UniProtKB/Swiss-Prot annotation:
<dbReference type="Pfam" id="PF00334">
    <property type="entry name" value="NDK"/>
</dbReference>
<dbReference type="InterPro" id="IPR034907">
    <property type="entry name" value="NDK-like_dom"/>
</dbReference>
<keyword id="KW-0479">Metal-binding</keyword>
<dbReference type="InterPro" id="IPR001564">
    <property type="entry name" value="Nucleoside_diP_kinase"/>
</dbReference>
<keyword id="KW-0460">Magnesium</keyword>
<comment type="function">
    <text>Major role in the synthesis of nucleoside triphosphates other than ATP. The ATP gamma phosphate is transferred to the NDP beta phosphate via a ping-pong mechanism, using a phosphorylated active-site intermediate.</text>
</comment>
<keyword id="KW-0547">Nucleotide-binding</keyword>
<dbReference type="GO" id="GO:0006183">
    <property type="term" value="P:GTP biosynthetic process"/>
</dbReference>
<comment type="similarity">
    <text>Belongs to the NDK family.</text>
</comment>
<dbReference type="GO" id="GO:0005737">
    <property type="term" value="C:cytoplasm"/>
</dbReference>
<feature type="binding site">
    <location>
        <position position="114"/>
    </location>
    <ligand>
        <name>ATP</name>
    </ligand>
</feature>
<dbReference type="GO" id="GO:0006228">
    <property type="term" value="P:UTP biosynthetic process"/>
</dbReference>
<keyword id="KW-0067">ATP-binding</keyword>
<dbReference type="InterPro" id="IPR036850">
    <property type="entry name" value="NDK-like_dom_sf"/>
</dbReference>
<keyword id="KW-0963">Cytoplasm</keyword>
<feature type="binding site">
    <location>
        <position position="104"/>
    </location>
    <ligand>
        <name>ATP</name>
    </ligand>
</feature>
<dbReference type="GO" id="GO:0004550">
    <property type="term" value="F:nucleoside diphosphate kinase activity"/>
</dbReference>
Length: 142
């Protein structure tokens, strides 16, 4: 099994609910290491750039508005099969369909305010981690 890196964003709804620590605990209990982290309030340009692949989709303006509505916590996670493991921890995009005990089942209120983002592939993970972190901001841990 390969050690991978993935990007996770704790979205404005979950930050507002004050569950950052509970989400971090789930990452760590699952064997993921937080190798970079920052809290920031995304600008419109940052949100549009990050979600550029969705620019032509109808939900894009609402997504950008939501992601800029309050602070987010962005982290790079590292571990064995980190991408799939993080997606398993997050649960289905729609919290109503998410398995009990997943982050979205426990902390999300709707498909739009769904608590967390996670990279969906190795290519996305590489691009997304680099979008928020320079190489010297990442602190690999063994």
């Amino acid at each position: 099994m390969a050690v991978e890196r993935t990007l996770s964003i704790i979205k404005p709804d979950a930050v507002a609910k004050n569950v950052i620590g509970e989400i971090y605990s789930r990452f760590e209990k699952a064997g993921l290491r937080i190798v970079a982290a920052k809290m920031l309030h995304l600008s419109q340009e940052q949100a549009e750039g990050f979600y550029a692949e969705h620019k032509e989709r109808g939900f894009f303006p609402d997504l950008v508005a939501f992601m800029t509505s309050g602070p987010v916590v962005v982290q790079a996670l590292e571990g064995e099969n980190a991408i799939a493991l993080n997606r398993q921890l997050m649960g289905a995009t729609n919290p109503k369909e998410a398995e009990p005990g997943t982050i979205r089942a426990d902390f999300a209120s709707s498909i739009d305010a769904n608590a967390v983002h996670g990279s969906d592939s190795a290519a996305s993970a590489e691009r997304e981690v680099a979008y928020f972190f320079s190489e010297n901001e990442i602190c690999p841990r063994s």
